[in-house]
Amino acid sequence: MTAIHVTSEIKTLKKVLLHRPGNELLNLTPETLERLLFDDIPYLKVAQAEHDAFAKILTDNKIEVVYLEDLAAETLDTDPAIREKFLKQFINEAGINTDKYKNIVYKYLDKIKDNKELILKTMEGINVNELDAKDRNVENSLIDLVSEESKFIADPMPNLYFTRDPFASIGDGVSLNRMYSVTRNRETIYAEYIFNFHPDYKGQVEKYFDRYNAFHIEGGDVLNLNEHVLAIGISQRTCADAIEMIAKNIFNHPNTKIDTILAFNIPNSRAFMHLDTVFTQIDTDKFTIHPGIMGPLEVFEITKGATANDVVVKEMKDELSNVLAKYLGIPSVDLIQCGAGDRVAADREQWNDGSNTVWIAPGVIVVYERNNITNDFLRAKGLKVIE
C-alpha cells in the first residue's frame, strides 16, 4: 500500500490530516486581518471545541486522524541537520532579512528543544518583544527604537487549519502547492519537509507540482472524480498556467492512471475562492453546487498531447450535468443547489460554505450546522447529514 492513495472524493475515508487551531489565532489583530486573509477574529476556545467535535466525528467513524504539527515534529526528530535546515528556511521565508535578526531568531527558536513545541511556535508567530533585549541591543538600534512594540518579526499562520489547501492528494502523489498569497505560501514548508524527510513518506510520494513553481494553485481547487479524471478549478486562487503545468506532469508520469483533467472556470471572486466552496461531490451521482456558478461556468477537457510538452484543451459545450455524467460513466447526475435553489439562502449559506461538505462513508457527509436550509435539502435527497 502506498503512503498516499486518493482516487475519489466519495470512497470510505480512512485517514485525514488536521491542524488543531492554536495560539496563531490569538495573534490576529484588526490591523492584520486583511493581510492574513481573515474577515474576523475567531474565538480560540470555540474554534478548538468545534475542531475537537469534528475530529471526534471522524474517529467515531473509524477514520484515522493525524496532525500536521505531529508529522512536522516527527520529521525534525529524525535528524538534527534537518531541524537546522528547517529553522534557517523558516527564518528566510518569514521575511527576516537582516543578519542580526536572523541570528537572534535562530537562537531564540533553537532554545526550544521539544520539536512539537518548536513547530507550534513557528505556526504561532514571533513578536519582537519575545526576543532577548540584550541580543537586540535595543538602546543602540535605530530599527528597534522606531519599530512598534507589538511588531511581529514572523507573522502567525492562522489559516493552517485549512489543511487541504497547502497540498492536495492526487492518486499516489501530491501537488505541493504554491499558494496565491505570500501569507499562505509559508504554510507549505511543513508539507515540504514531511514529504522529503518523514520516514512514512520520504521517497514514497510522487510530486506533481512544487511550491517553488512560478504559478499558483491551491488544494481547495482539486477534486479527484475517479482514478482517471481529475477536476481543477480556475479560480481566484488557482491559475490556468498552473493547471497546464500539473497536467503535463501527471500525464507524463509513468505510474499515473489519470488521463483527463476537467478545468472548471469559476468566477474570480472572494466568495467563490475555490472550486470546493461552490461544487462538491457527495455521492456517485450527486454534487452540491452554488446556483451562482451554473450559468457562467465553463468546463475545459485537458488530455495528453503529442509530445511531453503539449496538452490538448477542448471546451465542453454541454450542460454541466451531462459533462459530469459522461466522465463518471453514469446515466445522469443530480446537481443539488445550495440553499435549495433560493438565491438569497444560497448566497447566505454559500458564504458559510453551504456547498462544501466532507464525505466520510457511503451516503454519510459532514456539514456546517448553520446552513440549515441546505442541510435539510440534502437529507431530503437521502443522505445522512452529520452537523
What are these regions (language model features)?
Residues M1-E387:
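The feature marks the mature, well-folded catalytic cores of soluble enzymes
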